[in-house]
Amino acid sequence: MSKKTDVLIVGTGCSGLYCALKLPGSLNIHMITKSCVEESDSYLAQGGICMFKDESDYHAFFKDTLRAGHYENNPLSVELMIRSSRAVLDDLLSYGTDFARDEEGDLKYTTEGAHSTNRI
């Protein structure tokens, strides 16, 4: 079987989907996954996105992320993910993505996985 494509994205989790979203709509994009979409970490994560709220949380966020990745993460990638999380969230909000909110309409945060505070 052969398919012609402009872009092949390996991975159908949040990062792969966000990559596809940011590419020009005129491109023929294909995405592949190693198993099935419903077994990816992103699918099982209940829709949560780790959010960097302020500088006072940076070191704990960094440590929690390393722990969540069983210390196999690239520290530079972790820093980039943390520092860019607000911009990515703002971008997703501009597309109209619906996130959980509290009674005042602010984003609602919870704790999941190895995180030590509500930032998801």
Give short role names for the model-derived ranges.
Residues 5-31:
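N-terminal Rossmann-like FAD-binding beta1-loop-alpha1 element of flavoenzymes
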Residues 1-2, 22-24, 37-44:
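Solvent-exposed alpha-helices and their adjacent loops that cap or buttress functional pockets
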Residues 1-4, 112:
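A short, basic/flexible loop-to-alpha-helix module at the beginning of a structural domain
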Residues 1, 17-21, 48, 90:
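A generic short-segment signal for beta-strand/edge and adjacent turn/coil regions
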Residues 1, 22-30, 52-60:
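Generic structural signal for short, solvent-exposed loop/turn connectors between secondary structure elements
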Residues 37-120:
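Conserved N-terminal/central alpha/beta ligand/cofactor-binding core
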